[in-house]
Amino acid sequence: MNKNTISNIECVITKPDRHNLITVIVETESGVTGYGCATFQQRPLAVKTMVDEYLKPLLIGKDANNIEDLWQMMMVNAYWRNGPVINNAISGVDMALWDIKAKIANMPLHQLFGGKSRDAIQVYTHATSDTMEGLYEQVDKYLEQGYQHIRCQLGFYGGVPENIQTAQNPTQGSYYDQDQYIENTVEMFKNLREKYGKQFHILHDVHERLFPNQAIQFAKQIEQYNPFFIEDILPPSQTEWLDNIRNQSSVSLALGELFNNPEEWKALIINRRVDFIRCHVSQIGGITPALKLGHFCESFGVRIAWHCPPDMTPIGAAVNTHLNVHLHNAAIQEHVEYKANTQRVFPNAAEPINGYLYASEIAGIGVEMDREAAQDFPVEYRPHEWTQSRLPDGSIHTP
């Protein structure tokens, strides 16, 4: 294969709607350009610095064909490795290199992987409201749109705070009460099943808001309502407790959106402590490690449900869809409808059809960034109050 030298790398941050989205653009001497997602919205400028000041000088003049070698070099070049900033920066480059290779081959990305194992991937979306009436309205809307899987949340992560008794002069933060959350969420499941029966699969995200003993109690209480899966019932630092949950409840567990390092998921998969891996592809370093993770999971009967929130580019979401139609053990894809500005900056962003997402058949990833449109929405940093989650006594808890 003829050498295809990397001639330029650019990292662009744009905020078309609520989130700062990071795109890496890799140009080659052949004239083929690739696009990749590097979004770490809580620390966007750190990722851009990593790309501009460290990866770009390292990669200019290298052969874009050698994706595996370049990925390994980027990962070890700083000596310390596998953190959210460096992994997202590497991911942006890695996805762009795969985009280039698929464009040169004149085939959509999933065909470069080895083709499809399914026609389309089932999708779930988010229904969230402070009241059951509001939640019913959202569920009804999504059922009309053909969704068979809906993530249901009563209030924001941690639930709707009601008359929380805090300490005097409480420290600033986002307060919630774990006992209230458990009680209200179990009641939410009960109400949904009574109203809808088994018309759709219910998913729910605990978002690490419980202590391990509470997580066990919660899993036991909602088991009767047969959720499709419960996400992030514990933080990555407490995954040994998953064995205790497994021993007392048959609830399907999904975990992984906070993982960066393979050591965080190896034991979970080998010991079958989870049913679904929820890794965020750019947080683990891009397509190259995602393919390896997918095949590793398949050997142990663990299914894939990549993290795919609105705070990632439609480029990254399209990569998830290509992975999902290829990997035989892919189960479902998360999706939140794109707003108009995001669709303008990222043309060809896919939307579900009757509860399914279809991979693009355009050569490459199939979604690019309109650089001129992106300039209309410059980066705007915000302090992220929601990650300052506090219990009634004022102590910080994992968000």
Curated annotation (Swiss-Prot):
This chain belongs to the protein called D-galactonate dehydratase family member VME_00770
Q: Which UniProt key words apply to this protein?
A: Magnesium, Metal-binding
Q: Name one GO molecular function term.
A: magnesium ion binding
Outline what the protein does. Has no detectable activity with D-mannonate and with a panel of 70 other acid sugars (in vitro), in spite of the conservation of the residues that are expected to be important for catalytic activity and cofactor binding. May have evolved a divergent function.
Biological process (GO), any one: amino acid catabolic process
Report the family membership: Belongs to the mandelate racemase/muconate lactonizing enzyme family. GalD subfamily.
Q: Does the keyword Magnesium apply?
A: yes
**Record text on subunit structure and interactions:** Homotetramer.
Question: Where along this sequence does the record place binding of D-arabinonate?
Answer: H207, E257, R278, H307, E334
> Which residues are recorded as binding Mg(2+)?
D205, E231, E257
